[in-house]
Amino acid sequence: MPRKAASPEEAAGEPGPEEMEAGRPRPVLRSVNSREPSQVIFCNRSPRVVLPLWLNFDGEPQPYPILPPGTGRRIHSYRGHLWLFRDAGTHDGLLVNQTELFVPSLNVDGQPIFANITLPVYTLKERCLQVVRSLVKPENYRRLDIVRSLYEDLEDYPSVRKDIQRLSQEHLESQHLEEEP
């Protein structure tokens, strides 16, 4: 994962000259190459098999080895790296330390940072969709005697990319609100 040091534009999350030339700004959510190590322990405190995803320097999710329920793993990460956690089978979103994104901080006195992965409180509708998806084959969704909008909801599977887009939009909106007088 070696890479050149971040320019001031990159560090600020703004497009740098290379990205502007290519006509594509860098993604809002991406890891920063701080080169400051952080020892982290991922603790799967959920009943699900967890897939850790590191958002690389280009904002692309990179899968790491799965964590079975009730297990943990020491990870050598860096300050400013972004991590998401998903159910390995369904890609349902999970929480880490009560939030959707985990960003390691610097270790204090050599102690590792704990990333406690838990289930969120899903809405009743979300949980019902999860259960129906687990019991019914996708080709049989439209055979169910339910309202049409639920067919579409069932077919709208959890997606890491959609979540990254949503989190990016939320980040931009919160920055915009902070800038207003």
Curated annotation (Swiss-Prot):
GO molecular function, one term: ubiquitin-like ligase-substrate adaptor activity
GO BP terms: angiogenesis; blood vessel endothelial cell migration; camera-type eye morphogenesis; ciliary body morphogenesis; endothelial cell differentiation; extracellular matrix organization; eye pigmentation; homeostasis of number of retina cells
Annotated membrane topology: Peripheral membrane protein
Annotated SUPFAM superfamilies: VHL
Annotated region described as Disordered, given as residue ranges: 1-30
Localisation per UniProt entry: Cytoplasm; Cell membrane; Endoplasmic reticulum; Nucleus
Gene3D superfamilies given in the database record: von Hippel-Lindau disease tumour suppressor, alpha domain, von Hippel-Lindau disease tumour suppressor, beta domain
Subunit architecture: Component of the VBC (VHL-Elongin BC-CUL2) complex; this complex acts as a ubiquitin-ligase E3 and directs proteasome-dependent degradation of targeted proteins. Interacts with CUL2; this interaction is dependent on the integrity of the trimeric VBC complex. Interacts (via the beta domain) with HIF1A (via the NTAD domain); this interaction mediates degradation of HIF1A in normoxia and, in hypoxia, prevents ubiquitination and degradation of HIF1A by mediating hypoxia-induced translocation to the nucleus, a process which requires a hypoxia-dependent regulatory signal.
Keyword line: Cell membrane, Cytoplasm, Endoplasmic reticulum, Membrane, Nucleus, Tumor suppressor, Ubl conjugation pathway
CDD domains per UniProt: pVHL
Function statement: Involved in the ubiquitination and subsequent proteasomal degradation via the von Hippel-Lindau ubiquitination complex. Seems to act as a target recruitment subunit in the E3 ubiquitin ligase complex and recruits hydroxylated hypoxia-inducible factor (HIF) under normoxic conditions. Involved in transcriptional repression through interaction with HIF1A, HIF1AN and histone deacetylases. Ubiquitinates, in an oxygen-responsive manner, ADRB2. Acts as a negative regulator of mTORC1 by promoting ubiquitination and degradation of RPTOR.
Main location, first listed in the record: cytoplasm
Region called Interaction with Elongin BC complex, residue ranges: 123-132
Species: Mus musculus
UniProt domain comment: The Elongin BC complex binding domain is also known as BC-box with the consensus [APST]-L-x(3)-C-x(3)-[AILV].
Upper lineage: Eukaryota, Metazoa, Chordata, Craniata, Vertebrata
InterPro entries xrefs: VHL_alpha_dom (IPR024048), VHL_alpha_dom_sf (IPR037139), VHL_beta_dom (IPR024053), VHL_beta_dom_sf (IPR037140), VHL_sf (IPR036208), VHL_tumour_suppress_b/a_dom (IPR022772)
Pathway: Protein modification; protein ubiquitination
Name by which UniProt lists this protein: von Hippel-Lindau disease tumor suppressor
GO CC annotation: cilium; Cul2-RING ubiquitin ligase complex; cytoplasm; endoplasmic reticulum; glutamatergic synapse; nucleolus; nucleoplasm; nucleus
Family classification: Belongs to the VHL family.
